[in-house]
Swiss-Prot record:
The UniProt record lists the keyword tRNA processing: no
Single GO BP term: amino acid biosynthetic process
UniProt cross-references to HAMAP family, sorted A to Z: Shikimate_DH_AroE
Protein name: Shikimate dehydrogenase (NADP(+))
Species: Thermotoga maritima (strain ATCC 43589 / DSM 3109 / JCM 10099 / NBRC 100826 / MSB8)
Statement: the UniProt record of this protein carries the keyword Ribonucleoprotein: no
Catalytic activity field: shikimate + NADP(+) = 3-dehydroshikimate + NADPH + H(+)
Alphabetical UniProt keywords: Amino-acid biosynthesis, Aromatic amino acid biosynthesis, NADP, Oxidoreductase
Assembly, per entry: Homodimer.
Chain positions recorded as shikimate binding sites: S13, I14, S15, T59, N83, D94, Y201
Active site per database record: K63
C-alpha cells in the first residue's frame, strides 16, 4: 500500500522516516511519502492524493479542509478535523494520542488550552471525553475560538498570563516554541501548575522553563505522536506492536 503525509510546510515531518523504517523492519511492502501542498492548491491536489494513495495523514493547515473530501468518523465530525485517512474514510487519531498520553496523570482544573486550530480541537475533545469540565481557551482571535463550538470559556492572548495564574493545567496547541519563541507566561504563573503539555515534539522554552520551576507533570508532543501513530497503523490494518515500539524508540531518541 501507498501512504503519505500532506501539509504546508511538511519538510520537517519525521513521519516518512518513522513509517518507512517500520515497514522495512516489519517486512511490509508499503511506502510512505511526503506531499507539500500550499493552501491555494489544496482543492485540486486533494483529489489526486485520494486517487494515488491508499491512506494518508494530514497536518497543519489541512486537517479541517480534508473533512469535505472524505467520509468522517463520528469523532472527526465532532472535532471538525481529520488527520488520518484510509480509503476515503477520515479519522481523528490526535485525540486518542492525547488521552493515552495522559494515562496515570491527574489533569487538575481549571485547564488552559492555548490555540484554536485542529490540535486544540483534538485536545479539548479528549479532555471532555476524560470528564474535564473547566476548560479555558486562549487565542489570538476570539472569533476562531468561538468557532470551536465546545463548552469552554474564551480569553484573548493578552490575558494569557493572568489566566494561567489561576489555572492548574496548561496545554500549548500552537506552533509557538518550534523556533525558540516563548509564550507570554511568567514564572510566577507557571510555577503553580501541576501539568504542562506541549504538542511540539521537542523541548520548547515552555517545557524547559516548566522543568526548571518543578512542574510535576510535563508532557511533550512526542508521546502524543507515539499513540497517534499507533492508532494510524491500527486503522490501516498493519500494526505490529513489537516492531513499532522498537522503531519509534530509535527514530525519536
Amino acid at each position: 500500500m501507498k501512504f503519505c503525509i500532506i501539509g504546508y510546510p511538511v519538510r520537517h515531518s519525521i513521519s516518512p522516516r518513522l513509517y518507512n523504517e517500520y515497514f522495512k523492519r516489519a517486512g511490509m511492502n508499503h511506502s510512505y511519502g511526503m506531499e507539500e501542498i500550499p493552501p491555494e492548491s489544496f482543492d485540486t491536489e486533494i483529489r489526486r492524493i485520494l486517487e494515488e494513495y491508499d491512506g494518508f495523514n494530514a497536518t497543519i493547515p489541512h486537517k479541517e479542509r480534508v473533512m469535505r473530501y472524505v467520509e468522517p468518523s463520528e469523532d472527526a465530525q465532532r472535532i471538525k478535523a481529520v488527520n488520518c485517512v484510509f480509503r476515503g474514510k477520515g479519522y481523528n487519531t490526535d485525540w486518542v494520542g492525547v488521552v493515552k498520553s495522559l494515562e496515570g496523570v491527574e489533569v487538575k482544573e481549571p485547564v488552559v488550552v492555548v490555540g484554536a486550530g485542529g490540535a486544540a480541537r483534538a485536545v479539548i475533545y479528549a479532555l471532555l471525553q476524560m470528564g474535564v469540565k473547566d476548560i479555558w481557551v486562549v487565542n489570538r482571535t476570539i472569533e476562531r475560538a468561538k468557532a470551536l463550538d465546545f463548552p469552554v470559556k474564551i480569553f484573548s492572548l493578552d490575558q494569557l498570563d493572568e489566566v494561567v495564574k489561576k489555572a492548574k493545567s496548561l496545554f500549548n496547541t500552537t506552533s509557538v516554541g518550534m523556533k525558540g519563541e516563548e509564550l507570554p507566561v511568567s514564572d510566577d504563573s507557571l510555577k503553580n501548575l501541576s501539568l504542562v503539555y506541549d504538542v511540539i515534539y521537542f523541548d520548547t522554552p515552555l517545557v524547559v522553563k516548566a522543568r526548571k520551576l518543578g512542574v510535576k507533570h510535563i508532557i511533550k508532543g512526542n508521546l502524543m505522536f507515539y499513540y497517534q501513530a499507533m492508532e494510524n497503523l491500527k486503522i490501516w490494518g498493519i500494526y505490529d506492536e513489537e516492531v513499532f515500539k522498537e522503531v519509534f524508540g530509535e527514530v525519536l531518541k
